[in-house]
Amino acid sequence: MQIAKVRGTVVSTQKDPSLRGVKLLLLQLVDEEGNLLQKYEVAADNSVGAGFDEWVLISRGSAARQLLGNEQRPVDAAVVAIIDTIHVEDRLIYSKKDQYR
């Protein structure tokens, strides 16, 4: 799994029929220290409802397809959780509550 920040949405009017109704998000990956990386990825969000600027947890591969309920969907990554806090040892790396203060 990987931590990422939602940077936007991806809209496509022409797509594989199995992706109809699936929200696609543009994510910026985050390292273990909470730093934004210069790497982006598109992930499906079929159940979590993540929004702009939220930090999320993504799963890849067959686990992502299982989450979406259709292992035949052409999906490499899926959002599995919206992150509330991240602690590393005794340090708070991220807090959703403090994000907009």
From Swiss-Prot:
Pfam families: EutN_CcmL (PF03319). GO terms for cellular component: carboxysome. It is found in: Carboxysome. Residues 1-84 form the BMV domain. It comes from the Bacteria. InterPro entries: CcmL, EutN_CcmL, EutN_CcmL_sf. GO terms for molecular function: structural constituent of carboxysome shell. The keyword Phosphoprotein does not apply. One of its GO terms (biological process) is photosynthesis. Probably forms vertices in the carboxysome, a polyhedral inclusion where RuBisCO (ribulose bisphosphate carboxylase, rbcL-rbcS) is sequestered. Has been modeled to induce curvature upon insertion into an otherwise flat hexagonal molecular layer of CcmK subunits. Homopentamer. Interacts with full-length CcmM. PANTHER family: BACTERIAL MICROCOMPARTMENT SHELL VERTEX PROTEIN EUTN, ETHANOLAMINE UTILIZATION PROTEIN EUTN. This is Carboxysome shell vertex protein CcmL. It comes from Nostoc sp. (strain PCC 7120 / SAG 25.82 / UTEX 2576). The lineage of its organism: Bacteria, Bacillati, Cyanobacteriota, Cyanophyceae, Nostocales. The gene is ccmL.
